[in-house]
Amino acid sequence: MTYTEIKERKEKRYYYRVKSIRKGEKIEKQRVYLGANLNKQQLRDLEKKADEKLTGKIEEKSAKEKVIEKQEKTGKKTTFGISKEKNFSEWYTEIVKKAELGDLRYNVKGFLVFQPWSVMAMEKMYDYLEEVLQKKGHSPYWFPTVIPEENFMKEASHVKGFSPDVFWLKEIGGEKLALRPTSETAFYQMFALWIRSYKDLPFKTYQRANVFRYETKATRPFLRSREFYWIEAHCAHATQEDAMKQVHEDMETTKEVLHDIYGLPFIFFERPSWDKFPGAYRTFAADVLNPDGKVVQQPSTHFLNENFAKAFNVKFKDKDEKEKYCHITCYGPAISRIFASVIAVHGDDKGLRFPWKIAPIQVIIVPITNETLIINEAKKIKDELQENRISCKIDDSEARPGEKFYFWEMKGVPLRIELGKKEIQEKKLTIYRRDTDNKEKIPRGKLLEFIETASKEINKNLIKQADSLFKNKIIDTGTKQELKEIIDAGKIARCGFCSTEKDGEKCAEIVEKEINAEVRGTKLEKEKPQGKTSRCIICNKPAKHVVYIAKSY
């Protein structure tokens, strides 16, 4: 007798094809798992296939089938297995959940609960950036979260640019206060009190902070939300030349940290005049390309010239006792958004992959069994690693070794040490590298030496892979049709453009409406329009600039 059995768990229906066979006085049942929440057609098709199996001897389920069935029953995946290339949106959403990076179930729309695995990584990201900023002369400050309305009103273009995004608190004591969307109007209010002489310059500050913006676009965890975590640096200078040197220093900082430590490839663009930071004279921003073909704006640095200095009366006396306005710059690396790029750029179909220096845990130690001998050796290894400032953990849970392997691979831990009786007897360790997906055995006494070498190789390898993918995504074009094809293929188009000043904005609007993309800007090293880039991609006038066009978040 063959029939379909249905079991309900946690609002899901699980289907099994069952064959009952009488053997003497006993009845044996053979089962084939069909799946969960199937429609009628799916059920019929799977029943037919199952019946073919049940007519003969049922083979033992493969390890993969067992894992999948267990995942369906428990709702908890021990392995990941979603194609990042084919379905990046699903991949990203699921890895945030399964790797326990953030929880969206907080009951205010657009706000995310940051979970330990993401916080541990972002704390390290903060530390590296702050270390570089302090080495370059920036002093840390903590400013209030609220900014009075009168501060906002002092710089007209800044007010116009940010007003729609501001969270306003109810009037307190007759004063209207905003939750900071950014802190120019807070810092420069104080700069006017602190700066007196040319001897005070350059005046270089920064703070780590959370900021609030009422995003009207669809929010995505870490990528776009109504509260995010960042560093903002604000500096005052005596001359334009000094201010522009600071802008270039900010770009160097971005390369030193984002590329060389976090492993993210990017291009710094000067934004066109219609896309500048509100109140800025010039805006420069780093764009990182996600696997879905959209660019993410990462750190931006802005030359504000004297605009804010005049609005807030930020002045200094030069050597001749003449009073002058300061030239101000600001720089904003959004840590939570950069973390989104780390997830997207380095992850693969198995889950996360972390660069060594920012991994929440750098080494996971997996005892093959929880016997005292093995656990004691695992503890010795853990102590040795921690003494050498390597973050590590022992997974002595009751899960099977295979499940532990899958789980920590999904979490992106760079190195795994597998420890069983055989390893102890041979005085060797089995090491798995997440970046290469390879295992090797090493002598127990060579562990620290191995990790020192591997940690450098892991970063180099991830950077090399990311750089290669990014480089191959930039395509030259000279026609609108070709431009559309490049953008639809998830790549960045390099093309000629008539102007990046206000007279080019109409062509940029056509790019948005017809191509569903944006003019991201020009490279810092000015490129000469020639060949395919010699004429404007939209109006066909002689091109003044070579620009880059892409979809964005």
Regions found by a protein language model. Name each.
Residues 69-553:
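NTP/phosphate- and nucleic-acid-binding module
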Residues 1-70:
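Conserved glycine(s) in the ABC-transporter nucleotide-binding domain "signature"
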